[in-house]
Amino acid sequence: MSDNGATMLSSNRIANSFALVVALAGGAVCLGPARADGPSFDCRKASLPVEKAICADPRLSAIDALVAEAFTGFEPAFGGDKRKIARALIADRNACGQDAACIVSAQNNALQTYGNAPSWVQDYNIALIGKKALDTAARHPGSLDQPLPSSIGQCALTHITALTTRLGDDPLETAGPEAGSLARFSNGGAGVSYEREPGLASSKAGDPVVMCLISISRDCPQGDERGRVYYGVDLTIKGTWVLPDSQHLCGGA
C-alpha cells in the first residue's frame, strides 16, 4: 500500500461501484471474470463456514485462487514473516463466516497486501459492502451510535461531528481542493484524504453515516497499526467514500 492511501479506489470508481448496489440488491449484476477451476483448496474437505461459502460461489472461488497466486510472489515490505502475515489475513477471512461482503473485503485486503488486486475485485468489494451498509441502516432506522467497527466486514451507524481540511484548520465546505479532507465521527472514527473528497463535499455535521471496516494493514512495522480503511455512506445525501483513518498508512512518516 502507498503511504498516502493512493491505493484507495478513485472517486469515480467508488461512484460507479455504489451504482451497482441497487443492482446487487435485485440480483441483476455480473462483475468480472470467474474461474471455473475452483478455489485454492479442496472443496471436498471444506469444513469452515467461510470455506463452504467460497466453494458455493464461483466468484468467491475465483478471488480465493487469486489470493493464493498473489501470495507466491509476495515479499514483506518491512522484513516481516511472510507466513505470519498470511496467517493474519486468513484469520480475517475465516472470521467472516458466510458473510460474502466480509469475505470479499478480507480477500481484497489480502490482494492489496500482496500487491496484486485486480480492479474487478475492488469494484465487487465496494458493491457488496455498499449493499451491506444500506442493509445495516435499514435494520436500525434512527438508531443511536454504534461502536467503531473493529473487524473487517463489520458495519456500524454513527454521525459526522466535523468536516475540515486534512490538517483540521479550516471548514471543508469553503476550502480549496489542495487542502484535502478530514471527517470525524461520533464513534471516534475518522477519514482522511489528501484531496477534496467528493463523497464528503456536500455532507454536513450531524448527518447519519454507516461506516464499514474493509482493510486492516497486516504488512507493517511492529507496533504500527495505522491506516485502517473504512467504507462510508452518508445516509442523508448518499455520498460515499473509501478512506483511511490516518494521514499515513503503517510504515509511513
What are these regions (language model features)?
Residues S2-G5, L31, G189-A190:
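N-terminal targeting/docking segments
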Residues D3-V21:
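Bacterial N-terminal signal peptides that target proteins for export
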Residues T7-M8, L31, D37, D145, ...:
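Selective for proline/serine-rich intrinsically disordered segments
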Residues L24-A34:
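C-terminal segment of classical bacterial N-terminal signal peptides
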Residues A34-T164, A179-G180:
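N-terminal alpha-helical modules
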Residues W120-A253:
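Cysteine-centric segments in proteins
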